[in-house]
C-alpha cells in the first residue's frame, strides 16, 4: 500500500468559502427547462408545471444560485419576450441551439421555481444582439420598487415586490465565433463598461460579472482579459471562467490530471486581474466567477445527428451526457480545485443542472435520477462550507501525456466555526490503495465522524433510470486517530469525504 501525508493546520487559511461556489446553471437549451424542470401533466408536476421530484433533487444539492437564462442562448434573447401573459409571448428561433423558444417559462415562472428550489437567480443579460440600454431596462424591471415604466410593468404582470436579483452576467462568451454578436476585447470592454455603469445606477447594490475568455484554449486568452479589463475594471466585480474537459481516447490517468490545467487557468486569470489593478493604482479587487465547469463530450456526436434530423423543434434532447464513474472522480477534483482557490473564486456554476450536461436526469413522463457526478457535488455543497485551509499534501506523483508530477492524492480541507474538519480526497491511482496520514494536531481533540467513499471497479459505470444506484457512495473503512494524527485508507480510484468532529 502506498502512503501519503497531509498537514491540516487551523492557522493556514486560504479564505472563507463563498457559498456561491456551489452554484449551478439552467439554460433555455435542450430539455433543461422544457421536459426537465418544467413538465406540465407529469404526475410529479406542481400547479405551475414544475416537477417536484426534480426540485427535491435540486434541494438535496443545496444550490445557492442558478445562472439563467444562458449561456449562448442569452446572446439572442429579448427579455421582454419572457414576461407578460403567456398567450401573448412570441415564439422565437434560437440561433444558438437551432431550436424554437416558446417563452412559456420566463422570468416570473423561473423565479418561482428558484424560490421553491431554495436558490437565487444569477441573471445574464444580452450583450450580443442587444446592448447597455436593454441591460439597464431588465434591472429596472427586476429590482426597482415602483413608479417607472419597467417596474410598473413588473407589477402589472403580477409581481408587486422586486425580484431583488443581486448578481448579473454581462453577456456570455463574447469572444466566441459561435456567439450571436461576437465582439473583440475592446468592443466588449466598452459595452460591458457602459452596461455595468447603467445597471448599477439603477441598483447600486448589484454585482456584475464580465466575460472572460470562453476557455483557456482560446487563441486570445490572456490578451482578451487584459484589454477588456483595461476598459471596464472599476465597474465590474468578477471575471468569468468557463472550462469543460473530455476523455474521448479513454486515457483515465490523463483525464484525471486535467485539474492541473484548471488550477493554472484560475491562477492566470487572477494574476491578470491583479496586473490591471496595479496598472490602474486601484483599490478595487476583481475576483473570479467560474460560472461554467464540468465534463462534456459524451453527447457531441449524438447532437449533430439530432440537428440533422430535427432542427428548430422545441426542447430537443441536446447535450445529454451520460456520466460515468471516472467523470465523477474528475468532478470531485474540480470541486477540490475550487475550494483550494476560495480566496479568488467567489462564484462557480456546475454547468448545467438538469438533463443538459447535468447531475440530474429525467425522462419525459418518467422518473428523475442522480447521475454519478451528483454525489461529489452533493458532498462538497453539504460539507465544504466554512474556511478553506491551505492543507499541505505530500503524495507520490505520476506523469501523463500533458502533465508531469501529478499527485496521486488530490485533496482539500475545510473547517467550520465549531472546529470540525472535513477532508475531500481523490485517489487517482488506478491500482493501489493509499494510507493517508492527516496531521490535525493544531485542532482541539477530534474524532472520526464519517468516511464516505465512492468507488467502482468499472470506470465507465453509469447510473440509469432502471439502475439509479449503480454508482453511489458507501461507508468507507474509516481509520484511526491518535495524538492528533489520523490514518485513513483511501481506495484506488476513489472519491473520499473524511469528516472529523470536535469532541
Language-model features: locations:
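Non-catalytic accessory regions flanking glycosidase/transglycosidase catalytic cores in CAZymes
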Residues: 1-224, 229-238, 262-263, 267-307, ...
Amino acid at each position: 500500500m502506498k502512503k501519503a501525508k497531509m498537514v491540516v493546520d487551523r492557522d493556514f487559511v486560504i479564505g472563507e468559502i463563498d457559498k456561491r461556489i456551489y452554484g449551478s446553471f439552467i439554460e433555455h437549451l435542450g430539455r433543461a427547462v422544457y421536459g426537465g424542470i418544467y413538465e406540465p401533466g407529469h404526475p410529479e408536476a406542481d400547479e405551475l408545471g414544475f416537477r417536484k421530484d426534480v426540485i427535491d433533487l435540486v434541494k438535496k444539492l443545496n444550490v445557492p444560485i442558478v445562472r439563467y437564462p444562458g449561456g449562448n442562448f442569452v446572446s439572442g434573447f429579448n427579455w421582454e419576450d419572457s414576461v407578460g401573459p403567456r398567450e401573448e409571448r412570441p415564439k422565437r428561433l434560437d440561433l444558438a441551439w437551432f431550436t424554437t423558444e416558446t417563452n412559456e417559462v420566463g422570468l416570473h415562472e423561473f423565479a418561482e421555481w428558484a424560490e421553491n428550489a431554495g436558490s437565487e437567480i444569477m441573471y445574464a443579460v444580452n450583450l450580443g444582439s442587444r446592448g447597455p440600454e436593454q441591460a439597464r431596462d431588465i434591472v429596472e424591471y427586476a429590482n426597482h420598487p415602483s413608479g417607472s415604466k419597467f417596474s410598473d410593468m413588473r407589477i402589472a404582470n403580477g409581481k408587486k415586490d422586486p425580484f431583488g436579483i443581486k448578481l448579473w452576467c454581462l453577456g456570455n462568451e463574447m469572444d466566441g465565433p459561435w456567439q450571436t454578436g461576437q465582439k473583440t476585447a475592446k468592443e466588449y470592454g466598452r459595452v460591458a463598461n457602459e452596461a455595468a455603469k447603467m445597471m448599477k445606477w439603477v441598483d447600486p447594490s448589484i454585482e456584475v460579472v464580465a466575460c472572460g475568455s470562453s476557455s483557456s484554449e482560446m487563441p486570445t486568452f490572456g490578451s482578451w482579459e487584459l484589454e477588456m479589463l483595461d476598459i471596464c475594471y472599476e465597474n465590474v466585480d468578477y471575471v468569468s471562467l468557463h472550462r469543460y474537459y473530455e476523455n474521448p481516447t479513454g486515457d483515465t490517468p490523463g483525464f484525471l490530471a486535467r485539474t492541473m490545467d484548471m488550477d493554472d487557468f484560475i491562477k492566470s486569470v487572477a494574476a491578470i486581474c491583479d496586473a490591471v489593478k496595479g496598472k490602474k493604482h486601484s483599490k478595487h479587487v476583481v475576483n473570479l466567477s467560474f460560472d461554467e465547469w464540468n465534463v462534456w463530450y459524451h453527447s457531441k456526436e449524438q447532437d449533430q445527428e439530432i440537428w440533422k434530423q430535427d432542427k428548430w423543434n422545441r426542447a430537443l434532447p441536446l447535450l445529454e451526457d451520460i456520466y460515468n464513474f471516472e467523470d465523477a472522480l474528475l468532478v470531485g477534483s474540480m470541486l477540490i480545485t475550487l475550494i483550494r482557490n476560495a480566496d479568488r473564486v467567489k462564484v462557480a456554476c456546475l454547468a448545467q443542472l438538469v438533463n443538459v450536461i447535468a447531475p440530474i436526469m429525467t425522462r419525459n413522463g418518467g422518473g428523475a435520477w442522480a447521475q454519478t457526478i451528483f454525489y461529489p457535488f452533493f458532498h462538497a455543497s453539504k460539507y465544504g462550507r466554512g474556511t478553506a485551509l491551505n492543507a499541505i499534501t505530500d503524495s507520490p506523483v505520476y506523469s501523463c501525456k500533458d502533465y508531469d508530477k501529478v499527485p496521486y492524492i488530490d485533496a482539500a480541507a475545510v473547517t467550520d466555526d465549531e472546529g470540525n474538519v472535513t477532508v475531500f480526497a481523490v485517489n487517482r491511482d488506478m491500482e493501489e490503495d493509499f494510507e493517508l496520514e492527516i496531521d490535525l494536531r493544531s485542532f482541539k481533540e477530534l474524532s472520526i465522524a464519517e468516511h464516505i467513499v465512492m468507488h467502482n471497479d468499472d470506470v465507465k459505470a453509469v447510473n440509469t433510470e432502471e439502475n439509479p444506484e449503480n454508482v453511489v457512495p458507501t461507508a468507507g473503512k474509516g481509520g484511526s486517530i491518535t495524538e492528533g494524527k489520523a490514518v485513513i485508507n483511501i481506495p484506488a480510484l476513489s472519491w473520499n469525504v473524511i469528516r472529523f468532529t470536535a469532541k
